[in-house]
Swiss-Prot record:
GO cellular component: plasma membrane
Residues in the signal sequence: none
Membrane topology, from the record: Multi-pass membrane protein
TM annotation in the entry: 5-25, 38-58, 67-87, 107-127, 133-153, 164-184
Job of this protein: Probably functions as a manganese efflux pump.
Compartmental location: Cell membrane
InterPro entries: Mntp/YtaF, Put_MntP
Protein name, UniProt field: Putative manganese efflux pump MntP
Single GO MF annotation: manganese ion transmembrane transporter activity
UniProt family annotation: Belongs to the MntP (TC 9.B.29) family.
Pfam families from the UniProt entry: Mntp
Alphabetical keyword list: Cell membrane, Ion transport, Manganese, Membrane, Transmembrane, Transmembrane helix, Transport
Coiled-coil segments: none
Origin species: Methanobrevibacter smithii (strain ATCC 35061 / DSM 861 / OCM 144 / PS)
Length: 184
């Protein structure tokens, strides 16, 4: 196997880890996800992990310094808000039905927030004058697989540990946001 292909696969796995963590969280907090909703998670995370390097590549160096300073803050605040909301919902027993709801809005926000690193990788691809098709395809496929795997593993953990696992899920999202913020 070509060393550049190995490098792309390693990058894809690294980029997919945030999507995996979020999917794991969703798996153990949203126990009633249907197969089609699980597929949506994989498709959304895979699509945004695929498209963000393309957008980063297009932006290239023209606005990279501005974007690289603002993007982590956007991801942090999105994940912080969603994480705090999950914790609040888990502590409010009257709102238990909200925990199991599926939301395209939340899914989109999570997919965007976890793909900020992929955007930065796209800027790097532009600086290295790399082609995009193969790396972006691999990144998207790996994110898709990791997201779906995360949900299934999370569902198993959620069944084992119970409903209050949502507090941990919210904390995980907040920690991912902090990691993104500190990584820049």
């Amino acid at each position: 196997m070509d060393t550049s292909l190995i490098s792309i696969i390693i990058i894809a796995i690294a980029l997919a880890m945030d999507a995996f963590s979020v999917s794991l969280t969703k798996g153990f907090t949203q126990k009633n996800l249907t197969k089609s909703q699980i597929l949506y998670y994989g498709l959304f995370f895979g699509f945004f992990q695929f498209i963000m390097p393309v957008i980063g590549y297009i932006c290239g160096t023209t606005i990279s310094s501005f974007v690289s300073t603002v993007a982590p803050w956007i991801a942090f605040f999105l994940l912080l808000a969603i994480g705090l909301n999950m914790i609040r919902e888990s502590l409010d027993s009257d709102d238990e039905y909200i925990m199991d709801t599926f939301s395209f809005k939340e899914l989109t926000l999570l997919a965007v927030a976890t793909s900020i690193d992929a955007f930065a990788v796209g800027i790097t691809f532009a600086l290295l004058n790399m082609s995009l098709l193969l790396p972006c395809t691999i990144i998207g496929i790996v994110a898709f697989i990791f997201s779906i795997s995360g949900i299934f593993i999370g569902k198993k953990l959620g069944n084992y540990f119970g409903d209050k696992f949502e507090i941990l899920g919210g904390a995980v999202l907040i920690l991912i946001g902090i990691k993104i913020l500190l990584g820049y």
